[in-house]
Regions:
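N-terminal cap/lid segment of alpha/beta-hydrolase-fold proteins
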Residues: 1-10
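Conserved beta-strand scaffold positions in the cores of enzyme catalytic domains, especially
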Residues: 3, 51-53, 223, 250
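Short, flexible hinge/linker loops that cap or flank conserved catalytic cores
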Residues: 5, 17-19, 215-217
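Flexible "cap/lid" subdomain of the alpha/beta-hydrolase fold that forms the substrate-access gate
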Residues: 9-11, 23, 59-95, 99-253, ...
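Conserved HGGG/HGGXW glycine-rich cap/lid loop of the alpha/beta-hydrolase fold
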Residues: 15-63
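Alpha/beta-hydrolase-fold serine-hydrolase catalytic core, especially in secreted/extracellular enzymes
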Residues: 278-279
């Protein structure tokens, strides 16, 4: 693990693979951390790819601003760019899952010169998602959890009774692919003082429910999504094609829930390799 300073914060980052390999930035979601890529990265390294997997803002112990506004999307994207710059990387293939995909879409739309390609997993283009919230009752039902997770009391609720609700989140139907070792690893991380409260500030910042348009993505893009995802419906995922003007591939997984990197790491890795031209 490498510690990388960016604008007064310090991020815990796993950097692995050949030093001269094409860089692949791996951005995790909630409620995980950089270890969510632990079964994906080893598949990428033999193809000559160098992986950079940070614990993002709120997850790295020394990157936890107290103000909810510090978790705005532009700040999260700035962290990712700062980590790349600290490693002397001008541009990288970006891969994101869940919230990591949200950051990835933002990077691809706003700083395409830094993004060689995008592989977004489990979260559609933000404009497609927000449109679905307006017109698709199913998506509104899927997204009912967002405001609750952004509430000031959310962390305490998750951690009450020995973190029963947090543990139930990892054991929810469809997420049972997580091994007992993985569940305990995430529980140890997110029950540490300050971790969960900081991670939930991503929701408190209001990014997902904002009306600010993101704009089209021009870089080569693959979107991997699941028909049994409890957070994102098919309508939002299918609308994503209308917001990518670069080469685009949509990959729909059957019988999979929301945590694809853990459920099917080899499938996710294969789509990354295909997108970056090594598959």
């Amino acid at each position: 693990m490498t510690r990388i300073p960016v604008e007064g914060l310090v991020f815990d980052v796993d950097v692995a693979g050949p030093e001269d390999g094409e860089p692949v930035l791996l951005l995790h979601g909630f409620p995980h951390n950089r270890l969510s890529w632990s079964e994906v990265s080893p598949v990428l390294h033999p193809a000559g790819l160098r992986t950079i997997a940070p614990d993002q803002r709120g997850y790295s112990p020394d990157a936890r601003p107290a103000e909810t506004g510090a978790y705005a999307l532009r700040e999260l994207a700035g962290d990712a760019l700062g980590i790349l710059s600290a490693l002397d990387i001008e541009s990288a293939h970006v891969v994101g899952h869940d919230w990591g995909a949200v950051v990835g879409w933002y990077l691809a739309a706003r700083t395409p010169e830094r993004v060689r390609s995008l592989t977004a997993v489990a979260f559609p283009h933000l404009d497609a998602y927000r449109y679905a919230l307006r017109v698709d009752p199913e998506q509104r039902e899927h997204s009912g959890y967002i405001e609750a997770l952004g509430a000031e009391s959310a962390a305490a609720d998750f951690l009450a009774d020995g973190a029963a609700r947090l543990e139930a989140w990892y054991r929810q139907p469809g997420a049972g692919v997580l091994s007992e070792e993985q569940i305990q690893r995430y529980l140890r991380t997110h029950t540490a003082p300050g971790t969960l409260r900081a991670a939930l500030r991503w929701y408190g910042a209001g990014t997902l429910l904002s009306d600010e348009p993101l704009g089209p993505v021009t870089v080569p893009t693959t979107y991997v999504w699941s028909e049994r995802d409890p957070a994102v419906g098919a309508f939002a995922s299918e609308q994503t094609a209308h917001h990518v003007t670069g080469d685009y591939r949509s990959v729909r997984l059957a019988g999979v829930s929301h945590w694809q990197p853990q459920q099917f790491p080899e499938t996710v890795a294969a789509e990354i390799l295909r997108r970056v031209g090594h598959g």
